[in-house]
Amino acid sequence: MSERTLPFALDVPCIAYHNLAFPLGIMKANINNFDEWLCNKLIDCKYENNYGRYNLFDSDIWDYAKGVTQTQSFHITPDLFNCNAFDIIGIIRYMIDHGNYIMGLLNEKYLPMKNAYGKYDFVHDFLIYGYDDNNRVFRSAGFGFLFSDE
């Protein structure tokens, strides 16, 4: 059994919006001069005066990280889970072993240790940045930065 955890910082300046918090957590853990980068790069790129107001969001959530991060997108359809050869755990482990962070959406109704577990639908974004086979858990960040081994 093995374990792997990619660098991820919890103490980022924005935790309310995951589209900012997740990449900032990755970059803070991987950039030596993160505070300088934040002041010189992020604020210049994201806080633009648009029609007399400041616009924080961009259509591409990773836009401000260009040159620092790279992203790939693929969608998993529900019918793929019915395929006998499909191993989602193996795919996640493979991606982490090759230095990739996984970001997506989960319904927390089906995640033990979450407030919504078994009670109500709560679809929210998440980031997986590690795994521990011995304890059969993934290291993840999610809503409100409640960290649990899911």
Model regions: which residues?
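Cysteine-nucleophile protease catalytic domains, especially the papain-like/related folds used
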Residues: 1-86
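Noncatalytic regulatory segments and standalone regulatory/sensor domains
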Residues: 133-150
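Active-site-adjacent substructure of cysteine-protease-like catalytic cores
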Residues: 12-15, 30-53, 85-137
